[in-house]
Amino acid sequence: MHGRAYLLLHRDFCDLKENNYKGITAKPVSEDMMEWEVEIEGLQNSVWQGLVFQLTIHFTSEYNYAPPVVKFITIPFHPNVDPHTGQPCIDFLDNPEKWNTNYTLSSILLALQVMLSNPVLENPVNLEAARILVKDESLYRTILRLFNRPLQMKDDSQELPKDPRKCIRPIKTTSFSDYYQTWSRIATSKATEYYRTPLLKVPNFIGQYYKWKKMDLQHQKEWNLKYSVIKCWLARKRMPHEVTHSMEEIKLCPTLIPTTDEIFLESPTAINSITDIYETEEEGWKSDTSLYENDTDEPREEEVEDLISWTNTLNTNTSED
């Protein structure tokens, strides 16, 4: 159920729409009709002709026993408008004792329009505006136009966008392939073309592997030990580089590889000596290939599977480094 103030304001609103006063528009901006927005134009044949003033009116539940609070949104340069608070200087609005319950919304708006077009120069609240108006009216007109320029822009339909966030450009989507290519160029971890040693592309490597395997097949434990030493040497010798060098310059394995018998005849420090030999040897595969020129036996299927498993393990380790 609505209160007394709401019913009175609803009556005043209907009266205002019925009379349709020229240069005055008002509408409630809250459901309880306590907050209003108002636009008042200056009267014709006055200094304020053509200017539009925007105001807010705040009513309370005590209306119409108490006057509302009226303020200008854009404070005009006017002798009867407080330059700090934006409140108009009208006696029945400033002094509750002079308020009359017979006053309505229409009477308040008409009083504001008359005050704007016919300022009272006695006891003004804006002394500077009163002084200029009395001394030089043309200068006062110029100042009024400057103060109300933003309102004139509204009439010329030159408003700024209401929501500046709508001017922000949308986020551009990027495909995964483009992202991956960009990442490969700028990431700290290089792509697969770096730090790789293609062992399977080395000439005679596969043949040498099978010959070693055949010689040491009867000593599987020793072969595994030798294989571990070779992997250790490769890990220590590998240096960061791009795969653009000649394959003849890459020394992947040593030329001197001790046999199984030598490993077991030597002292336990033999493995360390083998590692030292690997680090200092710089010759290629030529000397080793001469030792096995007459060996043409084909590897068995089981050995082929072992080779595939071994090469997969080796390539995985080197690429991950």
Curated annotation (Swiss-Prot):
<keyword id="KW-0067">ATP-binding</keyword>
<comment type="similarity">
    <text>Belongs to the ubiquitin-conjugating enzyme family.</text>
</comment>
<dbReference type="GO" id="GO:0006281">
    <property type="term" value="P:DNA repair"/>
</dbReference>
<feature type="compositionally biased region" description="Acidic residues">
    <location>
        <begin position="294"/>
        <end position="306"/>
    </location>
</feature>
<keyword id="KW-0808">Transferase</keyword>
<dbReference type="GO" id="GO:0061631">
    <property type="term" value="F:ubiquitin conjugating enzyme activity"/>
</dbReference>
<dbReference type="Pfam" id="PF00179">
    <property type="entry name" value="UQ_con"/>
</dbReference>
<feature type="domain" description="UBC core">
    <location>
        <begin position="4"/>
        <end position="153"/>
    </location>
</feature>
<dbReference type="GO" id="GO:0000209">
    <property type="term" value="P:protein polyubiquitination"/>
</dbReference>
<dbReference type="InterPro" id="IPR023313">
    <property type="entry name" value="UBQ-conjugating_AS"/>
</dbReference>
<dbReference type="InterPro" id="IPR016135">
    <property type="entry name" value="UBQ-conjugating_enzyme/RWD"/>
</dbReference>
<dbReference type="GO" id="GO:0005524">
    <property type="term" value="F:ATP binding"/>
</dbReference>
<keyword id="KW-0833">Ubl conjugation pathway</keyword>
<feature type="compositionally biased region" description="Polar residues">
    <location>
        <begin position="309"/>
        <end position="321"/>
    </location>
</feature>
<comment type="function">
    <text>Catalyzes the covalent attachment of ubiquitin to other proteins.</text>
</comment>
<keyword id="KW-0832">Ubl conjugation</keyword>
<dbReference type="InterPro" id="IPR000608">
    <property type="entry name" value="UBQ-conjugat_E2_core"/>
</dbReference>
<feature type="region of interest" description="Disordered">
    <location>
        <begin position="285"/>
        <end position="321"/>
    </location>
</feature>
<keyword id="KW-0547">Nucleotide-binding</keyword>
<dbReference type="InterPro" id="IPR050113">
    <property type="entry name" value="Ub_conjugating_enzyme"/>
</dbReference>
<protein>
    <recommendedName>
        <fullName>Ubiquitin-conjugating enzyme E2 U</fullName>
        <ecNumber>2.3.2.23</ecNumber>
    </recommendedName>
</protein>
<feature type="active site" description="Glycyl thioester intermediate">
    <location>
        <position position="89"/>
    </location>
</feature>
<dbReference type="GO" id="GO:0033503">
    <property type="term" value="C:HULC complex"/>
</dbReference>
<dbReference type="GO" id="GO:0043161">
    <property type="term" value="P:proteasome-mediated ubiquitin-dependent protein catabolic process"/>
</dbReference>
<comment type="pathway">
    <text>Protein modification; protein ubiquitination.</text>
</comment>
